[in-house]
Swiss-Prot record:
Quaternary structure and interacting proteins, as annotated: PSII is composed of 1 copy each of membrane proteins PsbA, PsbB, PsbC, PsbD, PsbE, PsbF, PsbH, PsbI, PsbJ, PsbK, PsbL, PsbM, PsbT, PsbX, PsbY, PsbZ, Psb30/Ycf12, at least 3 peripheral proteins of the oxygen-evolving complex and a large number of cofactors. It forms dimeric complexes.
Protein name: Photosystem II CP43 reaction center protein
Organism: Huperzia lucidula
Residue positions assigned to the propeptide: 1-14
Cofactor note: Binds multiple chlorophylls and provides some of the ligands for the Ca-4Mn-5O cluster of the oxygen-evolving complex. It may also provide a ligand for a Cl- that is required for oxygen evolution. PSII binds additional chlorophylls, carotenoids and specific lipids.
Protein task: One of the components of the core complex of photosystem II (PSII). It binds chlorophyll and helps catalyze the primary light-induced photochemical processes of PSII. PSII is a light-driven water:plastoquinone oxidoreductase, using light energy to abstract electrons from H(2)O, generating O(2) and a proton gradient subsequently used for ATP formation.
Database matches in NCBIfam families: psbC (TIGR01153)
GO MF entry, a single one: electron transporter, transferring electrons within the cyclic electron transport pathway of photosynthesis activity
Residues involved in [CaMn4O5] cluster binding: E367
Membrane topology: Multi-pass membrane protein
Phylogenetic classification of the source organism: Eukaryota, Viridiplantae, Streptophyta, Embryophyta, Tracheophyta
Cleaved signal peptide residues: none
Compartments reported by the entry: Plastid, Chloroplast thylakoid membrane
Amino acid sequence: MKILYSPRRFYPVETLFNGTLALGGRDQETTGFAWWAGNARLINLSGKLLGAHVAHGGLIVFWAGAMNLFEVAHFVPEKPMYEQGLILLPHLATLGWGVGPGGEVVDIFPYFVSGVLHLISSAVLGFGGIYHAIIGPETLEESFPFFGYAWKDKNKMTTILGIHLILLGAGAFLSVLKALYFGGVYDTWAPGGGDVRKITNLTLNPSVVFGYLLKSPFGGEGWIVSVDNLEDIIGGHVWLGSICIFGGIWHISTKPFAWARRAFVWSGEAYLSYSLGALSVFGFIACCFAWFNNTAYPSEFYGPTGPEASQAQAFTFLVRDQRLGANVGSAQGPTGLGKYLMRSPTGEIIFGGETMRFWDLRAPWLEPLRGPNGLDLSKLKKDIQPWQERRSAEYMTHAPLGSLNSVGGVATEINAVNYVSPRSWLATSHFVSGFFFFVGHLWHAGRARAAAAGFEKGIDRDFEPVLSTTPLN
């Protein structure tokens, strides 16, 4: 009779700690994992795991290319990107492709090229993934020792870490090269309402770049998410790229110190948990950037931030009522505070009304109207430009509020509009992903630590319902 489960299934967590494991099949008897445990069957089959790794990369790149072309096919140049539910074209536009002054799309061909390049790349990766999953060697250690590894080999693991860091650093420098030499990037702060420009005067001062890390995450401080100019962003990429590349060289050329060998668990599942923890942090940071930052995520493409839409509403009605003869400097609202303008806790002149809570908003359409003490009354009377009025009216009606059924707008709005901001989608999806990756980090860290301590026996599978069903074969 075919043995439906193996006693090995009770230890494997990290099959590495199970010296009796015979390589060969990818079934439950030989790996300790059933088919539904997916790539866990490949923990000690470096060649097959490479296939899974490459194929996964192919799926990611295929999604990017296919979704990119889908957005190009549906794109309507007359409407802003954020009204069309786009999430990829805004990223390409932010990099300065296909857009001109004011964020107007002047050419969609670069977007088409991007989609096609990703599709072609995904085909290459897909072929490589299938090749290594089906045809290539099960393990790489014998035929290609450079690409082979053992999870316990601390020196090899830090070498692989170093290679990854160098590739990440090179990626950071690609964005620097784009901003400096290859056409520049879109700067929402360029005079007159934003434009593509080359970033020439990089911020390389470490006290400025790393000062962001020391800021409070709350209120007007906003930690790294508060970055509001491209000089700091691109300068930060220079620093980060350099740190990653030097760190990569360091990890390739050194062996882990004794404290590191003692502090870490050195197993495949432990590395998985470390990676999930890092990705979780990335997800939470990306969530905050997409929601609050209007420099790295220009409002021309992603729609206004919440505070920006609120301040835009106050500005729009100030403009309207001032034209109708209201004295916006002295008019009182129903609470006795200023109806249009009031003072912040620190004395600056700010917009009055409910939007007072967003008084520290900085936005390119509003900053020209500020003076040394907040909003400048004479500028509000004489200097408001038509593009500022148009933009604030547009932002006022596109707040990042909305529900899954696409009925956007404020909850009290009767004629709700069919609109959900890309900021809502991006912030929500990255927060949820970040949360689940964090749970995955805890789960796999717990299993890896238990296995390393030697008390992980897995779940008792004797009474697993699936074992009483008829085998598929």
